[in-house]
Amino acid sequence: FCINKGMKLQDIRTRTAYNPNALPTQKAAVRAWLGGMSKEFPLSLTLTLKQTIVETNDRGTYRRALTRADCERIARRFTQKLNRQVFGKYAADKCGKSLKYLPVIEGERSNKHLHLHFAIGGLPSHVKFNQFDTLVTNAKLQVEHVDSEHKVDITDSGWIEYITKEVGTKDTDNVLWTLF
């Protein structure tokens, strides 16, 4: 269809299926809720992952594709290692000190290479932003299936929108709520 100058606003809304009375989708609700907390997550991180996992069993060794469960396990392990880098092993493991994380898997719905996006907050005052990249590098070297590339940046206003772009209209499966 074509929108032209002679059309009225109601015609455009009808043709584009705009409904002001429609309930918000899961995607819109999640984005609105997380957007309200975006100031709590001043750092952004993208981690690339190795796309195959080598497994060995009684029949031999084989490669299999990375799955969502693998991504969740890798994210959990990475956050554990990063917490140890930031707070020290004792404080992270025994005292429960942790950064705040909003992890999201990307690539599952779009058939791209699976990778992880994080919005990160709770950085203690003794850790400066320019040190954070080194801490991420050290943590990632201790996690088996994290690839060599990563990107640390200061979160801008569109980061939450960007990392939730694959969240469905009826589900929020891409967000790793268990690590939030």
Language model features: what each stretch is:
Residues 1-114, 122-180:
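Right-hand nucleic-acid polymerase module
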